[in-house]
């Protein structure tokens, strides 16, 4: 691939220029308790020994996940925002575990995913918790119990389903990364942007974040409404907008580390031409999704009235739609403010460097102890070939 996208000067100017391609706003609507949530989550992760020293804390803090949370939930305050901030912080700490050797070890990834899933199956009663498994699982157990405590069963089942989809996506990514599983196109078919979306809609972790809008807003959507048209399709559009935004924002970082689970990179490989052509194409797909979302949101009151929805349902759906909108515009707003995607973020993971909190699972010790080094990225069969089709437009 071309190398000019990795040069420092290009990195400094590329993201704002690329973000200007989006037709939707970059939110600046922050919860007033964002600063307090920032301190809370750093203390919470520190309590579970996620950070090895002060330098690790400073590196984490520069990524400003508190801002992402405050933009996702601008009306949440206090304990609710702290809970959302802990969820977002844990997400990214977990995600960073797979940037090194572990991400190329599907069997080890499957074991880790199974360990996390077991926590979701534990007794929620006091005293029904384990311990001693290390920072990642212990912090997740605390988070899981706090999120689910006192919630309605229908909500807890939905939330867990979305979590399982999220967790299993890491194993699938590891299989694809090592060539152990073909891309969804199969055979010799080229890999497409739609193939990337099929996996990234889960690995992006948007659905559990959307789920929190319900307890934070004091309502629970009925399953038929949540899973029916048009909300299910609006949630998918939200997934796609966040994926496309993230893939454009993180492009230089992922080019630097050789990650292939990026719609821009796949489109570039499929269509040829310059990388900025691929960026414009993906931005266009994001704009189409967002445009469809807003058109559908404008029709929702009429659709709900035709269905005989009561005023409480109208209010709940309106809040949920606002929550989806906050996630899309907030993700873009944060992407322009975080150090994760600027030149500092790219340099922080270049040359094989990992984040200081990237080895919390113990899997790397097992690998070094006798299971051999993982195959280098790209050494297996090429799984990055796209299919000759584009994702269908939401219309």
Curated annotation (Swiss-Prot):
Family: Belongs to the terpene synthase family.
Enzyme class name: lyase
Entry keyword set: Lyase, Magnesium, Metal-binding
Keyword Repressor among record annotations: no
Cofactor(s) this protein requires: Mg(2+)
Organism of provenance: Streptomyces malaysiensis
Binding-site positions, Mg(2+) 1: 95
Top-level taxonomic group: Bacteria
Matching InterPro entries: Isoafr/prist_syn (IPR048128), Isoprenoid_synthase_dom_sf (IPR008949), Terpene_cyclase-like_2 (IPR034686)
Family matches, as PANTHER family: BETA-PINACENE SYNTHASE-RELATED, TERPENE SYNTHASE
Biased composition (Basic and acidic residues): 346-357
Binding locations of Mg(2+) 3: 246, 250, 254
Protein name (Swiss-Prot/TrEMBL): Isoafricanol synthase
One Pfam family recorded for the sequence: Terpene_syn_C_2
Cofactor mode of binding and number, as noted: Binds 3 Mg(2+) ions per subunit.
UniProt entry tagged with the keyword Lyase: yes
Its biological purpose: Catalyzes the cyclization of farnesyl diphosphate (FPP) to isoafricanol.
UniProt-recorded Gene Ontology molecular function terms: metal ion binding; terpene synthase activity
Binding site for Mg(2+) 2: 95
Catalytic activity field: (2E,6E)-farnesyl diphosphate + H2O = (+)-isoafricanol + diphosphate
Enzyme Commission number, as recorded: 4.2.3.157
Region spans: Disordered: 346-395
């Amino acid at each position: 691939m071309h190398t000019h996208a990795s040069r420092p000067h290009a990195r400094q100017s590329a993201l704002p220029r690329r973000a200007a391609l989006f037709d939707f706003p970059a939110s600046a609507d922050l919860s007033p308790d964002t600063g307090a949530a920032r301190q809370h989550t750093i203390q919470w992760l520190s309590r579970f020994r996620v950070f090895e020293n002060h330098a690790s804390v400073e590196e984490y803090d520069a990524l400003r996940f508190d801002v992402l949370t405050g933009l996702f939930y601008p009306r949440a305050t206090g304990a609710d925002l702290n809970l959302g901030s802990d969820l977002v912080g844990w997400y990214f700490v977990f995600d960073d575990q797979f940037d090194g050797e572990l991400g190329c070890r599907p069997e080890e990834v499957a074991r880790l995913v199974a360990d996390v899933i077991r926590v979701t199956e534990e007794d929620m009663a006091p005293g029904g918790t384990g311990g001693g498994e290390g920072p990642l699982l212990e912090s997740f157990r605390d988070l899981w119990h706090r999120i689910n405590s006192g919630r309605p069963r229908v909500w807890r089942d939905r939330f867990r389903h979305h979590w399982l989809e999220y967790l299993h996506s890491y194993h699938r990514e590891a299989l694809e990364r090592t060539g152990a599983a073909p891309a969804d196109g199969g055979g010799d078919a080229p890999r497409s942007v739609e193939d990337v979306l099929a996996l990234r809609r889960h690995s992006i972790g948007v659905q559990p974040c959307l789920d929190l809008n319900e307890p934070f807003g004091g309502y629970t959507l009925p399953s038929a409404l949540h899973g029916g048209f048009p909300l299910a399709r609006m949630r998918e559009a939200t997934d796609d907008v966040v994926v496309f935004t993230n893939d454009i924002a993180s492009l230089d970082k992922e080019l630097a580390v050789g990650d292939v689970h990026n719609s821009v990179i796949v489109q570039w490989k499929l269509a040829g031409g310059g990388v900025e052509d691929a960026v414009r194409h993906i931005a266009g797909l994001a704009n189409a999704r967002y445009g469809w979302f807003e058109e559908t949101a404008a029709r929702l009151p009429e659709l709900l009235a035709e269905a005989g929805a009561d005023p409480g349902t109208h209010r709940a759906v309106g809040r949920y739609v606002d929550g989806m909108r906050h996630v899309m515009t907030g993700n873009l707003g944060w992407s322009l403010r975080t150090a994760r995607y600027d030149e500092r973020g790219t340099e922080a993971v270049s040359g094989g460097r990992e984040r200081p909190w990237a080895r919390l699972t113990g899997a790397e010790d097992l690998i070094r102890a006798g299971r051999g080094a993982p195959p280098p990225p790209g050494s297996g069969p090429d799984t990055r070939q796209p299919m000759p089709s584009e994702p269908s437009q939401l219309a």
